[in-house]
């Protein structure tokens, strides 16, 4: 799901749907941006596998705009995931 494909959910909604991240990189208020797989972002929520260090999912934000939820594949590439409906 991307912000362009439908109305962008807010941070509280995404938090409720995917839960608290294991780690966070950057901040939506951070002026510096990063680029991953062609997406510019300044905050990344990181979700690691339970009991491990392997990253299984990330949520990307650019400022307060939701960019999407992505499954991190074994080769390091991203696969878009739909936002869970809880």
Q: Where are the regions that the model predicts?
A:
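Residues within mature, well-folded domains
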Residues: 1-86
């Amino acid at each position: 799901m991307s912000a362009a494909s439908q109305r962008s959910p807010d941070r509280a909604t995404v938090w409720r749907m995917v839960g608290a991240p294991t780690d966070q990189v950057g901040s939506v208020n951070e002026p510096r941006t990063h680029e991953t797989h062609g997406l510019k972002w300044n905050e990344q929520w990181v979700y690691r596998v339970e009991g491990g260090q392997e990253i299984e999912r990330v949520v990307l934000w650019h400022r307060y705009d939701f960019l999407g939820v992505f499954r991190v594949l074994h080769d390091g590439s991203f696969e878009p995931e739909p936002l869970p409906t809880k």
